[in-house]
Amino acid sequence: MKNTLLAFSAALTVGLTGFTASAQRDNRLESDDIVTPLLGSAPSKDIKNVLEQNAPQTPNDNGLPRFALVGKERQFYLGIGAQFLGEAMFDFGDNMPSALDFTPSSITPKAPGNGGATRFAWQSSSFYMNFVAMPNSDNHIGVFLKAKFTGANNNIKVSHFYGKFRGLTMGYTHSAFTDGSAMPMTIDSEGPNGSVSKTLFTAYWAQDFTKNFSGAIGIDAPIADLATADSEESVTQRIPAIPLYLQYAWDGGDSHIRLSGIYRPMQYRNLTEAKNSTVQGGGIQLSGMVHIAGGLSAQYDATYGSAIGTYLQDDSDIVIDAVATTEPGKMKAVKSMGLTAGLNYAFTPKLSSNIMYSHLTNWLPSDAVAGPDTYRYGDYVAANLIYSFNKFLSAGIEYDYGHMKNIAGEGLHANRIQAQLAVTF
């Protein structure tokens, strides 16, 4: 693993005065003429900018179609597209259950004789609709829909469905606590384990205060992952979470720094006292990206809080917002910290590389009731090369490393080498 990282690091330091790129981590989206107008006319760059702003901002969550219908007098832009992602991978070390998501917290011990596995996947392929009405007006209206094949038995599952009007975003998409544009680019569908990435029903208002300063505040649908015991039980949630952020951007938007926060109270039933109780949760995040020089840019985020496990990649499916304690009927929040840092280098307009490291730690209360296999901390390392043949076809290769340790001190390691072919239209 060290040799792999050193090789990529050395490559990234070469030619800083060469190709000058924006902070875009995915060179498949770099060209200004990536969207071809149909049944109407408008500058391709304008269509790209409008549809790109209407789509999710996470770098591996494509929502930019290659063709768009242009309404009369440019009253609307409508793009309907799809992306096929064919992936082949080889896993070695301990067992990584999913062929789609490389998640350190899900690593399980390898069975005797199962030291390696060759696997294939296509389920992260997607189709999407990106629509913006009155794109050159302050009253522009946007609708975005995206679905993948990640449901049970490869059924279609909606990953985003939301509308926009002026500064309002409402629907099923990322929480405002997620800084998608600050996440490093990965071929792995999951991405860095310590980053905030939560999709749910949300509504938030984003506002530009000046040319450089902006902010947002909203509400997220109330959810709670509570590890109850015999004296507690989950109840329906009543109070939505409140995410907000303040951001400063420069360099034409290629660099920014964002301070985010979230407040999320969660209710449960105290069976000992026959009444409902509340766990108070909340967290802060510092995130951003910066164009350093030439084709080199960096991304980072640092998150800390109580009862925010649902919002962190590695904790989102393991029920660790709050845990039962030795006091009957009493639950306490789990404290969590996530850290991510990544570098991107664009060698040419067609070839780019990304390397990253991410870490997540959970601190359980001293009187927590938890099994020895409860997730304590994990690490995630990824390095990739992505080559774009044209705006429709690209390919990439990536190495992923994951490490996890439970509260009993037992550790597991998993490795993956994967190649991806992407066809987008």
Residue ranges and their predicted role:
Residues 71-100, 109-224, 238, 243, ...:
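Outer membrane beta-barrel
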Residues 249-369, 375:
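Detector for outer-membrane/organellar transmembrane beta-barrel domains
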Residues 100-109, 319-326:
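Surface-exposed loop/turn segments flanking beta-strands in extracellular/periplasmic regions
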Residues 387-389, 412-425:
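Outer-membrane beta-barrel "beta-signal"
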Residues 122-144, 245-270, 346, 351-358, ...:
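Surface-exposed extracellular loop regions of Gram-negative outer-membrane beta-barrel proteins
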